[in-house]
Amino acid sequence: MAIGTPAHEFRELNEEELVTRLNEAKEELFNLRFQLATGQLTNNRRLRTVKRDIARIYTVIRERELGLSVVPGAEA
């Protein structure tokens, strides 16, 4: 059962929204790592999920750079 955000949801976002989601995910990962270091983290699996979401966002951005994916709302 997948808990993270599927890649198709990221593909529906435009560039600004992707960058925003990426920054939010990076901030969450930082906070989770801080909680892990202080022993306050209750859900260790969330670390893996956030890392994978970050990787999915980078993948979608790279697909668009290579022209493998179309930006939603862009005219062909």
Swiss-Prot record:
One of its GO terms (molecular function) is structural constituent of ribosome. Disulfide bonds: none annotated. GO terms for cellular component: cytosolic large ribosomal subunit. Pfam families: Ribosomal_L29. SUPFAM superfamilies: Ribosomal protein L29 (L29p). GO terms for biological process: translation. Keywords: Ribonucleoprotein, Ribosomal protein. Belongs to the universal ribosomal protein uL29 family. This is Large ribosomal subunit protein uL29. It comes from Corynebacterium glutamicum (strain ATCC 13032 / DSM 20300 / JCM 1318 / BCRC 11384 / CCUG 27702 / LMG 3730 / NBRC 12168 / NCIMB 10025 / NRRL B-2784 / 534). The gene is rpmC.
